[in-house]
């Protein structure tokens, strides 16, 4: 049935929302003049620095650009497992 809906041009709400979110991210990147490669590099460096002081959960890590009040904001959600002791740093 899903195949038939796609064939007739009826997308599932999930794929529509995914496409909308992808377009939103592309527009934000364009407005901020930051390429996806630069954002990935920034994410890697943030993880590298924070990992010196904290044990983080890489799987739950999210770094994105968001449009807030006519400005672009870098938003990082970094789950912390535990703090490293001073002796471990």
From Swiss-Prot:
Q: Which GO terms describe its biological process?
A: cell division; regulation of division septum assembly
Q: Does the keyword Zinc apply?
A: no
Highest taxon of source: Bacteria
- Keywords noted in UniProt: Cell cycle, Cell division
Keyword match Protein transport? no
Pfam families named in the record: MinE
The protein's matches in InterPro entries, at most eight in alphabetical order, are given as: MinE (IPR005527), MinE_sf (IPR036707)
Q: Which HAMAP family match?
A: MinE (MF_00262)
Family that this chain belongs to: Belongs to the MinE family.
- Function, in words: Prevents the cell division inhibition by proteins MinC and MinD at internal division sites while permitting inhibition at polar sites. This ensures cell division at the proper site by restricting the formation of a division septum at the midpoint of the long axis of the cell.
**Protein name listed in UniProt:** Cell division topological specificity factor
Please name the source species.
Desulforudis audaxviator (strain MP104C)
The root-end lineage is: Bacteria, Bacillati, Bacillota, Clostridia, Thermoanaerobacterales
